[in-house]
Amino acid sequence: MKRREFLKSALAAGATLSAPAIFSAAKAQSRQETLLIVSESGPNNLDIHGVGTNVPGYEVSWNCYDRLIGHEMKTGPNGQPYYDKDKFKMELADDMKLGDMSATFKLKKNAVFQDGTPITAKDVKWSLDRAVTVGGFPTFQMAAGSLTKPEQFVVVDDNTVRVDFARKDRLTIPDLAVIVPCVLNSELVKKQATEKDPWGLDYVKQNTVGSGAYKVVSWVAGTEVVFERNEKWIGGPAPKVKKIIWRMVPSAGNRRALLERGDADISYDLPNKDFVELKSDGKLNIISTPYSNGIQYIGMNVKNPPFDNPKVRQAVAYAIPYQKIMDAVLFGLAKPMYGAPANASTEVAWPQPHKFNTDIAKAKALMAEAGYPNGFETTISFDLGFAGVNEPICVLTQESLAQIGIKCTINKVPGANWRTELNKKVLPLYTNVFSGWLDYPEYFFIWCYHGKNSIFNTMSYQSKETDAFIDGAVTAAANGDKATYEKDVEGFVDQAYADMPRIPLYQPYVNVAMQKNVSGYAYWFHRRLDYRTLAKG
């Protein structure tokens, strides 16, 4: 898809709030060996397999657990290190042999968990069994790569595990390199398991039990996570940073102040206005990278009135104040996903823009055709954990929808509860972001549009036509049938934009601000920080 030019707005100077000095906990150590990260919200669970684990929880799992394989790096679109979705490297495995319908992994013989327990093939199998059995997000994530049954994971010997393929699927091997198929200390977790909690979810929620480069030594939910380097890690060169302190600082003004006076080393969820101003100041390093396979969107619950009516959904799509959001909320730091030319052909790509633009007259006409000439009342919800973007989007949308008679009450959901509330699939109208870990169009649509109704099909959208296109693309990709694959990708994109159960707004950027003496940032599919490569000069 061709890149698009976007508006760069003139910025008004903003007052910076005073902020507390919060690096005192690290003064006893060399500042070069300790990194302070500040963000708006933090993890609600240390276990990627846990119920309702939020996005910040992904960062904990990524840095504290190993997987059998990972990705090589390449140079990204902005010249920075960027994961290579097509190239894999060994992580916990020392060797991978690919067969026609299986992959066999030899484990590193000297690999141990953070408590010194040797890692065996039994730990790998138990961990993968857990992922496909525990339910919810992790189980659906594994299924996206056709990994669905414990019988697919076979212990060959203490040092060898085999993964049997359910079918040919190009997503299977990439799916083993995402966060979910991490390896846990099975014997330790089993000791904490109960009849009601056979997978030890309660224990792993509070404790890291992996072999990754870092381990959590303390966690106060909503306040702070402290990591220490795992000196027993053998997955690569020893990380240069010994200690990571991750503080939750809700005020964006305070986070900016901490960066500007040098107390904090990294922040990655400041308002876009701040990132633009900080980049202009030149005192910090600012890195902006488009989300891979990701969009911010307005979602509608299509199983219940009034959003079960396609004309209502189209009316909302015409009423969204797209350009105002780009200008006033994002300050140009995003790729628009709206306003494609009326004669534009659908591309074999995702994300790609739809053809809707703000047109209040069209929206009013569609509301009348749908039987709602006077509108209706509803709520629009957002995740408070990312309020800096979500709240102004909802306010601007509320104002614009009022012009077509839709009166919205804004529902602010605490970040720790957001995933749980969203997964109930009862929110009528909401904004959210989704970024597919595997950078393939069909992967995004499996999660967000397929009638299997994954947790990320937050609209409860059902379409046999869309399902047929998605399933066809998966099969065609596995068989190398390029022509059918392209036809099916175009088909499910067209169907999604005709039915419009969710309205793409833009492809977000990951914006990271860091001190000039911090190096080693790399972009990953999960959009979170990888501590292994970070360093301080």
Where in the sequence are the language-model features?
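Extracytoplasmic/peripheral linker and loop segments enriched in polar/acidic and small residues
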Residues: 101, 326, 403-418, 423, ...
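Structural transition elements
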Residues: 214, 335-369, 386-392, 480
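N-terminal lobe/hinge region of extracytoplasmic solute-binding protein
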Residues: 38-100, 129, 209-213
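Ligand-site clamp/hinge motif
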Residues: 202, 231-277, 399, 407-409
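Surface-exposed binding/hinge segments that line
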Residues: 97, 141-193, 220
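Periplasmic-binding protein-like
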Residues: 47-50, 172-176, 274-277, 287, ...
